[in-house]
Amino acid sequence: MTRKILIVLCVLFVMPVFVITGCDEVQENLSLKSSFIADFSCEYRKMNITGKLSASGKKLINISLDSPNTVSGLSVTYKGSDLEISRENMICSADEAYIPESSFPNITKEILYGIADGRAVFEGKCEDVCTYRLDSAFGKAVVSTNSKGCISKISVDGEDYEMVLSDVKDANG
């Protein structure tokens, strides 16, 4: 009788430990890569935007758009505090104030700058996905990475913004 009680207690108290540890908070803080080149697909304000994103920390961010067709070929480049908008052979330098604050390129830039500044806070790891929280002017951003620190997804609460990155490569080689 006592043996059965011990087995039941063991199952009730030891088994949950194995089940709960599948997704846990890891104390080691894996560093997010802020220099990369990737393809992206972003749901932004009920619009699907695709293109290529390259970032080198806060030095250079380039967003080249493939779709929708109305913006295909448009490229937005942030070089420090300078902004360039280009399409085909036309390049226009502008002040960042000309881009609306909650626009797709500006939200993307602010999140990537926050990552480069080290403001993303590690929240946990589940299997091979690490999750970070980043407080921004647009609300709470959730950044997901693989186990090597390569960004795979960015979403922003309070904005209709969810970006999925694919074919992510290190910009440093």
Where are each of the predicted segments found?
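Gly/Pro-enriched, hydrophobic low-complexity segments
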Residues: N62-N69, L74, A120-G173
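N-terminal leader/targeting segments and the immediate start of mature chains
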Residues: I7, P16-L60, T70, A97, ...
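Bacterial N-terminal signal peptides that target proteins for export
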Residues: M1-L9
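Repetitive helical segments and hydrophobic/amphipathic motifs
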Residues: L12-F13
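An acidic-aromatic
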Residues: A55-G114, E159-E162
